[in-house]
Amino acid sequence: MRHIKTIDDITKDGKVEFGDGYDFVENTEEADAILMRSTDLHGYELPTSIRAIARCGAGVNNIPTDEYAKRGVVVFNSPGANSNAVKELVIAMLILSSRGVVQSMKWVRAHADDPNILVDAEKAKKAFVGRELKGKRIGVVGLGNVGSKVANACVDLGM
């Protein structure tokens, strides 16, 4: 049985992936490994029992990798794990900005108490039509985990 100490908030779904043979402990002294996200481990008192550190994220700038390597502690990260989420946010921003969604929401809030909102909305709606993304060109700088997903999603949108 391997014992894992989680330092940051790790979802239950993430912990379930470990399956049998692993349990999660509260005390770092009992742990064989640490599962973490963003806590800065520079200056962290790492028990000698720790053999591995897994970071749920792309970078390892919050982990003193050179120091831990000298101690034989293996450091893992998960580059690209959030790439789909980032791609979705990029596409959302493209749609929001091309269609004036934020501006139209502000207009609705500003006119929410207006008894003539339907008439006024009919007059104002042309300002919020925006442009379709289909047929537009986009430049994607870098085709790594995120960039390639963004580029493919844009192709799927007809860009």
PLM feature segments, named:
Residues M1-I4, S38-R55, H111, N116, ...:
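Long, low-complexity, intrinsically disordered polar/charged segments
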Residues M1-S78:
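An N-terminal-biased, well-structured beta-alpha scaffold segment characteristic
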Residues I7-T11, K87, G147:
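A structural signal for well-ordered alpha-helical scaffolds and beta->alpha junctions
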Residues E17, L89, M93, K149, ...:
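Rossmann-fold NAD(P)-dependent oxidoreductase module
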Residues G59, A81, L143-G144:
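Short donor-sugar binding/catalytic loops of nucleotide-sugar-dependent glycosyltransferases
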Residues P79-R137:
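Phosphate-binding beta-alpha-beta segment of Rossmann-like dinucleotide-binding domains, i.e.
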Residues K123-M159:
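Rossmann-like dinucleotide/phosphate-binding beta-alpha-beta segment
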